[in-house]
Curated annotation (Swiss-Prot):
The chain crosses the membrane at residues 3-23, 48-68, 141-161, 177-197. The gene is apl. It comes from Lactococcus lactis subsp. cremoris (strain MG1363). One of its GO terms (cellular component) is plasma membrane. InterPro entries: DedA_domain, VTT_dom. It is a multi-pass membrane protein. This is Alkaline phosphatase-like protein. The keyword ATP-binding does not apply. Belongs to the DedA family. Keywords: Cell membrane, Membrane, Transmembrane, Transmembrane helix.
Length: 214
């Protein structure tokens, strides 16, 4: 994977960077850390510049985020509510009100979420889908996405340029960081799933009292 990424970047320059970063947003397993840090290193031996590299990466990030945003718009809250109001909702123990609550939560805290999640592996890409489903205003989404990805790109491209031949060291550190974050997210997901199952399938009987068994 890394060799293919480097070949594309060497051959297509800025366009290759923008394309790869766009695909990385849609297909998170592609390592953006390698693209950005190697992109920074490329500026030390080619005609490509740091500013151009950052701009290309940011354009690619925003385009990829927009694709997922509109995927979220297709999978709207209204459609989700219709889905859970039928048999699927009974199986999952979900109600239309649950979808509405989730939408309200996202609209209340979604602006900060969109910005800060741009620094978290995996979530960085996927957060665009609920933003679209909740119908977050497109200008706000674009501004927050651009700011978050711009900061991320500036840091990694600059580190790659500063370290030169040692750019892979940063990519390795960030890969370890990504693995830890994904593991933590996995644990949180499992705990959340267990809590959801407990509440839905094993609800507490509020009317229960010791005297009721006598």
């Amino acid at each position: 994977m890394q060799e293919i990424i480097i070949q594309v970047m060497n051959q297509f320059g800025y366009f290759g960077v923008a394309f790869l970063i766009m695909i990385e947003n849609i297909f998170p397993p592609i390592p953006s850390e390698v693209i950005l840090t190697f992109g920074g290193f490329m500026t030390t031996y080619s005609e490509l510049g740091i500013i151009g590299m950052i701009i290309a990466a940011t354009i690619g990030s925003v385009l990829g985020a927009l694709i997922l945003y509109f995927v979220g718009r297709l999978l709207s809250v209204e459609r989700l509510e219709r889905l859970v109001s039928g048999r699927l909702g009974k199986v999952l123990r979900l109600k239309p009100e649950d979808i509405t609550k989730a939408e309200k939560w996202f609209l209340k805290r979604g602006y900060a979420t969109i910005f800060f999640c741009r620094f978290i592996p995996l979530i960085r890409s996927l957060i665009s889908v609920p933003a679209g489903s909740a119908k977050m205003k497109l200008p706000s989404f674009l501004i927050l996405t651009t700011l978050g990805t711009l900061i991320w790109n500036i840091v990694l491209v600059s580190l790659g340029a500063a370290l030169g031949d040692n750019w892979e060291m940063i990519a390795g550190i960030l890969d370890s960081y990504s693995s830890v974050v994904v593991a933590i997210l996995g644990v949180i997901f499992i705990l959340g799933l267990l809590l959801f199952v407990k509440k839905r399938f094993f609800p507490k009987n509020k009317n229960y009292s010791p005297d009721s068994e006598k």
